[in-house]
């Protein structure tokens, strides 16, 4: 959270839209960093909204949760002072259209914060064809569903094309090795390996892999965490821009 959110702050009283809040993981961090701002957090999934409400205690926090589609926003133009989007565009078939929809409800002078990963930025040791196979299954499965897990490198072009100004994109590099056990556990194992394992059934259904090859690949990928010389590197990208008009 510090890596991605240490420089995200909103002024007291400002109205912030969080588009694609999921189960509220980022919402909780936003509230922690800007306790006196007001948040509207939306997601297309009602089960996720229910979980987010439970996790943040909506009744006693300055956040309102809303189940809606970000391509059909129920807000007047120029409603929000700021907009925050994290790990959403990679799942969309039309990220350009999503940015334009969101921009329409942002006030002139307001900031737009956008965070995405880039699966093409992944490097690890021990490296192997087996480990790269399951990683590539993750990338290909998302691509076949219309998403783009390599979208991190496109943040600047996307924001520029949408008409934002004062665009600043910064890479947020993650490096995990045995000398940083908290990163090995929290990132390599519980984020990366868990994320790849989560696409197993879809990869099998799509014919991208077989069961034996998948298990061999996951064992190889986990060695980046449990090997005495295991290393995992990954880069997130954070873009902040302003709507002038």
Predicted segments — roles?
Residues 81-94:
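A short SAM/SAH-binding and catalytic strip from SAM-dependent methyltransferases
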